[in-house]
């Protein structure tokens, strides 16, 4: 309040800093929550998306080490059960009118049945199974890319990563506004209370 009164009294150009910061924090909050839900459900709860992504990385680079490390503790039969639960949970946490496109696929082809979707995915994909995946990676490079591009897991991977990237873009946009506001606030407070001890703005 004292700061606001000082701005009004002195005519300093800092009147919008606090309202703008408040608005930026409010606007970033849903994107932060949705990013966390995506991570907890599709990038760590169920492991098939990350496995599929690393399969594409290995296909491009020829380096299979990280992919092999993932398979060490991976249980496809368990993930087949986990994936439907994660898809169902995630849908309740995201805006109904803005979902990853895989939900449209599941609704149209499987009547919204996540379990049926997971059963078909695991039955027709090579990605969950290390022996099948390594056999594919041993093929001619063009054949590898073609096989993985047509693998059903990649549709899920692309859906999740495209959506995640769109959320991250918005999050970073608002985070930039927050960091800018914090720098401006530091400068304003330095004028408002020039003798007050405060941390360096090196981190702002």
Residue spans for each PLM region:
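Terminal presequence/propeptide segments associated with secretion/organelle targeting
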Residues: 1-204
